């Protein structure tokens, strides 16, 4: 539901989880086989967790932050964690990158560029719940 000023979208938890289930169906329908999931904290943690459980794949977490100003609604400088948290081993093979939102696309582009520079990753694809009309990452 959009606010009266049209600036904010409010989504119920039920709708949020339905969107995650739809995303899981899209990933499954793609037929792409992946080895691990990497979610971007904070927004990608819940979708990443659910997809990890549905597909029974290890979940890695990378912390990123750029929305700090104006109550967390204005994008600022992008900070990315130096390390990726994994339950065991390293991020490798075919990796599904998961986040909640591709807003400007800056975060996803920066993370993808960093991951593509990692020789242990053989293939990389992304899955997000929402993509804005101005995102440079699709």
Model-derived regions, located:
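PRPP-associated nucleotide enzymes
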Residues: 1-138
